[in-house]
Amino acid sequence: MTELTDLSLADARDALRQKKISAAELAMAHIEAVEKARALNAFLLETPERAQAMARASDEKIARGEAGPLEGIPLGIKDLFCTEGVRTTAASHILENFVPAYESSITANLWRDGAVMLGKLNLDEFAMGSSNETSYFGPVVSPWRREGSTAPLTPGGSSGGSAAAVAARLCLGATATDTGGSIRQPAAFTGTVGIKPTYGRCSRWGVVAFASSLDQAGPITRTVRDAAILLRSMAGYDPKDTTSVNLPVPDYEAALGRSIKGMRIGIPKEYRLDAMPAEIGKLWDQGIEWMREAGAEPVEISLPHTRHALPAYYIVAPAEASSNLARYDGVRFGLRVPGKDIAGMYEETRAAGFGKEVRRRILIGTYVLSAGYYDAYYVRAQKIRTLIKRDFEQVFEQGIDAILTPATPSAAFGLGEKGAKDPIEMYLNDIFTVTVNMAGLPGIAVPAGVSAEGLPLGLQLIGRPFDEETLIALSGVIEAAAPRVSYPSSWWG
C-alpha cells in the first residue's frame, strides 16, 4: 500500500470512508513525519496530543456514519489563523506568547467538517515577505534542492511553512493567506497547488490582519482536486466579517474534468518582461499550447496599468499594515517592554517586538498616510488600483473566461540570496501576483514543469470574481498535461 503520508487528500478521504485506514493511524503517520522534519522549520508549534484526540473522535464519527467532508484529514494551519487555546504568533516576537480565546472562522469551518490539526505553520512575520526569512523563529527551508547542490532554498512566502509542509508530505493540506501572492508564489516554488480565492469568499475573521482590503485566505495542497476539496470547507459567508460575501459555496471538486472547449483564455502582453528568464517564457508558451490542445482559444489581451501595480501595491499594503499594527502597543496583549512613561513603553515594546521588515513597512505606511504626502502617494495609489481593476473588468466584458500568466519570474532562490541590500529585489517576486489582490480576483498557481536546475515552476490562472470553478477546471487541464512533479526525497530526516 502507498505510504500514508504519500496519499493525496482525496485518496485519504476515500480510504477513510471505506474504512481501509483509520484516522488515528493516518494522524500518527503525519505526526511522525513532522517530528522527523524539524530541520525544515515548517512548524512553529506541533500539537500531537490534540491531533490524536481529534483523530479518535473522527474514527468514532466514521463508525457511526456521521463523517464530515474532511473527517480525519490531517492539516497544517498557518500561524496567522487564531486557534482557541493554542498559541498564535504571526511569527512575531510581539505575539510570541499570545494564546487566543477564540477560533478563526476558517479553522472553525475545518473542525466542523472533521479535519485534524497537526500544528501551526511558520510564515514571514505578519505575512510580510516573499521568502519566509522575516520570521522571528527563523526561516523555513524548502524540501527542494537544486540538482547537485545542498544549498538551502526558500519555499517562498509568506506562506512558506504551509507550502514546505505540503511538499514535504508532512500534512495533506494547509491553510494559507495571500495579500500580494503569498499563496501562489510559495505554491509555484514548491510544486504544490495554491488557490487565492476572490476577496470576500473566505472569512477574514480571526486571521491576524496585514492589509485588510487585500488579505484573503486559501488552501495549499498537492493536487488541484485536493485544493478544491479544502476550499469548499474553508469558504462561506460569515456575518462576523463585514467583507464576507453571502453567496452559495459551489462544489468545487465537481468542476474538475469539465470541458474547457470554446473558452477564451487571455494572454496579457504586459507580462512578457524583457528580463524574464527564457525558461519562464517557454513554460508560459507550453501552457498556452495545452489550453489550445484542450479546445480553448488563447487570445492576446492588454492590461495596460499592470506596470504600475507593484509600486501602487507597496503603498496601499504598508499603509493598511501601519494602521492594523498600531494595535500592538504592549497594553492589551502580547509583548510588553517597560519604558519611562506610557509613550516610552509603546516605543520600547514596538522596537523590540517587530522585526526589521515589519518596521520598514510600518514606516513606509505611516509616511504615505501623513498629512503632507497622503494625496501624492496613497490617494494616487488607490486611483491606480481602480484603473487596474477596470483593466480586468474590460477584458472580462470582452468575453475572456480566464487569464493565463507565469506564477513567478523565476524558480526558488537560495536563502540569503535576495533582498539583503535592496528590499526592492525581493518585492519584485510579486510582479505577476499583486494585480490579482489589487483587483480582488481569484487566482491559482498550478505546477507546470521544472527549471534547468530541477526546481518546480508554476503557471497562474486569474478568473472572474467568484468563478473559482473555471480556474479549477482549467488547472485540471494543466495538471493532466504537465509532466508529474516528483516530490523530493526526504533528505531532512
From Swiss-Prot:
Its EC number is 6.3.5.7. One of its GO terms (molecular function) is ATP binding. The active site is at residues 78, 158, 182. It is an enzyme of class 6 (ligase). InterPro entries: Amidase, Amidase_CS, Amidase_dom, AS_sf, GatA. It catalyses: L-glutamyl-tRNA(Gln) + L-glutamine + ATP + H2O = L-glutaminyl-tRNA(Gln) + L-glutamate + ADP + phosphate + H(+). Pfam families: Amidase. Keywords: ATP-binding, Ligase, Nucleotide-binding, Protein biosynthesis. GO terms for cellular component: glutamyl-tRNA(Gln) amidotransferase complex. One of its GO terms (biological process) is translation. Allows the formation of correctly charged Gln-tRNA(Gln) through the transamidation of misacylated Glu-tRNA(Gln) in organisms which lack glutaminyl-tRNA synthetase. The reaction takes place in the presence of glutamine and ATP through an activated gamma-phospho-Glu-tRNA(Gln). Belongs to the amidase family. GatA subfamily. Heterotrimer of A, B and C subunits. HAMAP family: GatA (MF_00120). This is Glutamyl-tRNA(Gln) amidotransferase subunit A. It comes from Beijerinckia indica subsp. indica (strain ATCC 9039 / DSM 1715 / NCIMB 8712).
